[in-house]
A protein has these predicted regions:
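Catalytic-domain carbohydrate-binding cleft regions of carbohydrate-active enzymes
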Residues: 2, 29-30
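Non-catalytic accessory/interaction domains
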Residues: 5-8, 12-15, 20-27, 35-175
Length: 175
């Protein structure tokens, strides 16, 4: 899962207030990594730390210790998604929960930091303006609410294979 973990680092290196993209943040982190460690024997922690240090306001930097569970904890997380539309408030709430089954030697699992690239679509497949974003699931369960919707949207989750998880989503035939 090494390549997937590095790709998640890139996704999470997006610079919050600075507005830089994940690719730009990742490139800054790579530059810092080589400045610090060129020619040295290094660890995965050194690499992750450099990416985070180059992007101090990023989702990666603010959750680095928890993100490192991808290197220490075995198994593939199962991500369960559920959506609920409230016509009265014109809002749709997405709830994501995660669970990683026990593996030999690791019966108790901590939540992973999971970037979920997503967007919302109208029933006809038209994108809902302003809905594309990366949600960061870093606990067992979290919810996000999207407002000013005229009808229940269809969620497009894990765009670009943003995380190596198994998605459980009870979608209708139309979705």
């Amino acid at each position: 899962k090494g390549a997937e973990v590095v790709r998640m680092m890139q996704t999470l290196a997006t610079g919050g207030a600075s507005g830089i993209s994940g690719r730009e943040g990742f490139a800054r982190g790579m530059k810092l990594y080589f400045e610090r460690h060129d020619g040295q024997a290094v660890t995965c922690d050194d690499f992750a730390q450099a990416i985070a240090d180059a992007n101090p306001d990023s989702a990666l930097a603010t959750r680095l210790d928890a993100f490192k569970r991808w290197y220490a904890q075995a198994g593939t997380p199962r991500l369960k998604a559920a959506g609920r539309f409230d016509a009265e408030t014109r809002s749709w709430t997405l709830t994501l929960s995660q669970h990683t089954p026990a593996t030999p030697g690791q019966t108790d699992k901590w939540p992973f930091v999971i970037p979920v690239a997503m967007g919302l679509l109208q029933a006809d497949g038209t994108p809902v303006a302003g809905s594309e974003r990366v949600l960061v699931l870093d606990s067992a369960q979290q919810s996000w609410t999207f407002d000013a919707l005229d009808a229940a949207p269809v969620a497009s989750l894990l765009r670009g294979f943003s995380a190596p998880v198994i998605l459980e989503w009870e979608a209708s035939e139309a979705e």
